Swiss-Prot record:
UniProt site positions, description: Reactive site: 29
Family matches, as SMART domains: CY (SM00043)
Protein name: Cystatin
Lineage: Eukaryota, Metazoa, Chordata, Craniata, Vertebrata
The protein's role, per its UniProt record: Inhibits various C1 cysteine proteases including cathepsin L, papain and cathepsin B. This protein has no toxic activity and its function in the venom is unknown. It may play a role as a housekeeping or regulatory protein.
Compartment(s) of residence: Secreted
Gene3D superfamilies assigned to the protein according to its UniProt record, in alphabetical order: 3.10.450.10
């Protein structure tokens, strides 16, 4: 007796294709790597830099040098996990009108011997439908 293999071939191919997917796509809520040039990552990084400067007791602004690594997680919205390098600028903070991200990025750096670089990890929670971003975690050294 000969049995047809056709009905089994389709589901078998589908199973093989699913097994070859990256593991992050198979875990709901898992971390996924993101390109540091992704517009959503850039927006989260800008927000993180502004929040860092608002919360920091330092008398000078720090600007973004580069995003070292970016990951995201689907939660109620998106959570971005960013590793970034920040550098102390020559721009002093003044009371009244804090600088926005683009202004901070235009600040000059001090001479090489006086430069202070920070390695920071930020978690930014984005909920676009509420037009809200929140810095949920920050650590720099």
């Amino acid at each position: 007796m000969v049995h047809s293999q056709l009905p089994v071939a389709g589901p078998l191919r589908l199973l093989c294709a699913l097994l070859l997917l990256p593991s992050a796509t198979m875990i709901p809520g898992g971390l996924s790597p993101r390109s540091v040039t992704d517009p959503d990552v850039q927006e989260a990084a800008e927000f993180a830099v502004q929040e860092y400067n608002a919360l920091s007791a330092n008398a000078y602004y720090y600007k973004q040098l580069r995003i070292v690594e970016a990951q995201s997680q689907v939660v109620s919205g998106a959570k971005y996990y960013l590793t970034m390098e920040l550098m102390k600028t020559k721009c002093a903070k003044t009371t009244g009108k804090p600088k926005v991200y683009k202004e901070i990025q235009n600040c000059e750096l001090p001479p090489k011997a006086q430069q202070e670089k920070l390695n920071c990890r930020f978690q930014v929670w984005s909920r676009p439908w509420l037009e809200k971003m929140e810095l949920t975690k920050m650590s720099c050294n």
